[in-house]
Swiss-Prot record:
Superkingdom in the source lineage: Viruses
Signal peptide start and end residues: none
Keyword Hydrolase assigned: no
A Gene Ontology term for the protein's cellular component: virion component
Protein's GO biological process: symbiont entry into host cell; virion attachment to host cell
Annotated source species: Bacillus phage Nf (Bacteriophage Nf)
Protein name, per record: Head fiber protein
Gene giving rise to this polypeptide: 8.5
Subcellular localization: Virion
Main subcellular localisation: virion
Cited Gene3D superfamilies: 6.10.140.1630
Classification via Pfam families: Phage_head_fibr
UniProt keyword terms in alphabetical order: Host-virus interaction, Viral attachment to host cell, Virion, Virus entry into host cell
InterPro entries: Phage_B103_Gp8 (IPR022741)
S-S bridge residues: none
Length: 257
């Protein structure tokens, strides 16, 4: 046990929870604030300014006036004017009732030396509100946009995450993600012949198949013949000449032998 002298900061009733106050060269005591962890319990009535001795014992149990009906096993915290009340808030619970009590009666509280600490986003002090909203899982679109600004510095990536990429953004993103020049050319929709060959080799596609020319015995690709205008012949000889020109074009294209 350790004892020291303190002064009552206000009128204090016995069996109420107390807190420590410092004053010039003295220690003062008063009722503990609601929903805080108390430091002492009063065992006698005091008037404001009274000098008293505080005896500190190992924490075991306190007898305190109940603010409300309390059941054995209820977790308790500081109520109004230093009384004790039930609580489910583990951050403010300082013990648990080991006896029944009606409001205004004495209840025995076992002092818990282990406190469960729960930290919420609002407890994080100097933290951006958008980060707190994210941690609470209730971020708005505006919060999300600000978070992306916090997390991402690359403007093209930001544009992608914001769903507003321009063509320049897309090209820059492809340059960020892909190092192979042949694939980049393909993604940029401008591969030259050599690049096309490289890409086919990369995916195991080989050389494109070319249809053979059609013959009388072999099926092949259909070729286009040069355009021919309508014949303007007014006599048989000219008409035959135009027809022979058409036949020649068809032979060249492989339609006929």
């Amino acid at each position: 046990m350790y004892s020291f002298t303190a002064y009552a900061n206000s009128d204090i009733v016995a069996f109420h929870l107390l807190k420590f106050l410092s004053s010039e060269n003295n220690i003062e005591i008063s009722y503990a604030d609601e929903d805080t962890i108390p430091e002492y319990v009063s065992i006698r009535d005091l008037k404001a300014g009274d000098k008293t001795t505080i005896d500190l014992y190992p924490l075991v149990a306190w007898k305190v006036i109940a603010q409300e009906d309390i059941t054995t096993g209820d977790r308790v915290s500081v109520g109004k004017n230093g009384q004790v009340k039930k609580t489910t808030d583990l951050r403010t619970a300082f013990g648990y009732a080991v006896s029944l009590a009606k409001a205004g009666q004495l209840v025995t509280v076992a002092i818990s030396t282990v406190f469960d600490t729960i930290i919420t986003p609002d407890d994080l002090g100097n933290v951006d509100d958008d980060v707190k909203a994210f941690l609470k899982s209730n971020a708005t679109d505006a919060n999300k946009a600000k978070l992306r600004d916090l997390l991402v510095s690359n403007l093209d990536v930001k544009a992608f995450l914001n769903g507003s990429t321009s063509e320049d953004n897309k090209i820059n993103l492809r340059n960020l993600l892909v190092s192979n020049p042949a694939i980049l050319a393909f993604l940029n929709a401008n591969p030259d012949t050599d690049t096309q060959t490289t890409l086919r080799t990369m995916i195991g596609a080989g050389t494109p198949y070319t249809l053979p020319a059609a013959t009388t015995t072999t099926l092949g690709g259909v070729k286009r013949i040069p355009a021919f205008g309508n014949s303007t012949a007014t006599d048989v000889a000219t008409l035959v000449k135009d027809f022979n020109n058409l036949l020649a074009a068809m032979r060249t294209a492989g339609y006929i032998l």
